[in-house]
Amino acid sequence: MNELVLGWRTLLLLLVSVHLLIAAAFLLRRQHERRANTYLVLLLVVAVGHFTPQMIGFAGFYDRWPQLSFTPFALDWFLGPLVWAYAWSLTRDDAPPPGHWLWLPGFVELGYGLVMMVQDGATKAWWSEHIHRPYIAHLEDSGGLIALIIALVLSWLHYQRYRAWLKDHSSAASEFDPRWLGAFLVAMGVLIAAIGINEAAILLFGPLSYFQQYPVYIAAGAIFYVLALGALLQQREAFPKMPTADMSDGAPESEPAGRDWAGEAADLRQRILAEDWHLEPRLTAPELARRLATNETYLSRMVNLGAGQNFNRFINTIRVEAVQRELAGGAEDVLRAALACGFNSKATFNRVFRDITGMTPAAYRARQGVDTPSGD
């Protein structure tokens, strides 16, 4: 009977796989972004499945147990849908489109593997030589890559739309940076490049051996390893969520002639100050519209047309002016005044203050002729 060999190639892939599964277990325990983290965990599990045929192949599993052939460890047609579902779920509360159909290709691949796995050895050998390797293997590889490319394009466009939504609809845009999602998508782009190089080599030179494809698997393992660490270390708070209606890009309605948008924006500003709503660091346009008993479209027009600003800058301008009043009134601690006026951190306050006033808080205090005991 063939002996198993745990060489360095197997051990390296095993080490990566174990770490990915440990990271997945920690992600499942997180209380925030549970739905998105579930998709990320599944993505890491599918990645481990992708490495498994190589990992056990180098160890001699297929030589010792030929019946393992066609076992559906690698389910690459799930990769693209999981990337899209993760990006969507970080930024939205509803299910990623197109619903259950999103998972159909992956389950087709799984079903095919399960059916072939239980066939006898002679049937497997004939099918592999005449059908699977000439046709289906190429379809699986190219289909998985195409699905991943489509998912990345859709996710990147959605990411850009989300960044624009943050600026227009959330006062937390200055302190909340969705860079983790951007980094995740860039990593997926690098993964696509690695897989694409492998597929191009197969087209140019014919089928590649386990040894020839091993560097691509190591590159993929490194990418997923970095992603797992990034998810554990960087993604520490929930993303502000886009409401369902914001995905539609319908044409705006015509504006009523003669409406005093500037006056309405001024009234809105006074109402926000009177209610102290600007003191809430995570105030959003949908929440403010609800409190005003109006709709978000009308509120956005009031801010955009009346104040000439997006929602984020409109609220932060009110906060900066509140800090300036605190300092003019004798407040000595700049940071304490900033936190009392709706800012969540010193870094965010310094950045927003400089952006709106054109100077740092320290320079502003100096212009007022007062020493700055605390600030930037």
Feature names for model-found ranges:
Residues 1-19, 142-145:
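Hydrophobic transmembrane alpha-helical segments in integral membrane proteins
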Residues 13-23, 39-58, 79, 112, ...:
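Hydrophobic alpha-helical transmembrane segments of multi-pass membrane proteins
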Residues 27-39, 89-100, 164-177, 209-210:
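Membrane-interface helix-boundary motifs at transmembrane edges
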Residues 49-72, 121-128, 201-207:
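Helix-loop junctions on the outward
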Residues 66-67, 134-151, 218-221:
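Alpha-helical transmembrane segments
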Residues 91-118, 132-144, 171-188:
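The cytoplasmic-loop to transmembrane-helix boundary for the fourth helix
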Residues 189-243:
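Interfacial "cap-and-anchor" motif at the non-cytosolic start of specific transmembrane alpha-helices
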Residues 232-336, 340, 348, 352-355, ...:
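Membrane-proximal linker segments that couple transmembrane helices to downstream signaling/catalytic modules
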